[in-house]
Amino acid sequence: MRPLCAFDLDHTLVRSSLDLVRLKVEIRALVETEGVSLSEATRAWTIGQIIAAATAHRETLGEACWALCTMHEEVAVADASPEPGAHEALSALRAAGYPLAVWTNNTGTIARRALTSCGLDGFFTVLITRDEAALKPDPSGLRLLEAAFPERRIWVVGDSWVDGAAAQAGGAAFIAYGADPVELARRGVAPRTVLRDLRQLPEWLRTAAW
């Protein structure tokens, strides 16, 4: 039985202008403007952690942060294009019998729009978004994938340390794509491999030992 390949969306399957560093700066500024003190140590927090702190301070502030996230995502999806090699890699994996899924921190609406506009929607039978599961690096999305694909091992493919941390926390194997090995190591993420071209993935999986 082939393992499941679960892909992150932005900067893994889809190339877009979504700038998570800029978004994080804007969310921090919004939260601090509303009287929430964020220490220097919180600069290592994920966007989700900052929004959780904002929500604990005031629910409407958390909602404002999520609205800012959605605005950035909607702007980014308008100019989204397939990541180089995505079509070829997914076609080869499907032909080889691998089930395919998407696991993203985006909303379902944005994720479906991005996949459709890039011509990738037909490859996937399951889509896990922040509408269904907590944000990565929380591994709860992995539990949903396991329920959808029982008895299958799972490879998680993504560009960020949060993808790897979520995979590791949930007991899945992580394949990094275009990621910075130094940042992965700093975050305690140990990928099975780091690929620079998605078209390398089918052949790598063919010879990979679990």
Where do the model's predicted regions map?
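Asp-based, Mg2+/Mn2+-dependent phosphohydrolase catalytic module
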Residues: 1-3, 108, 112-210
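A short helix->loop->beta-strand "cap" motif at the edges of active sites that frequently abuts
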Residues: 97-98, 172
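Conserved phosphate-coupling serine/threonine residues in phosphotransfer and NTP-handling enzymes
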Residues: 104-106
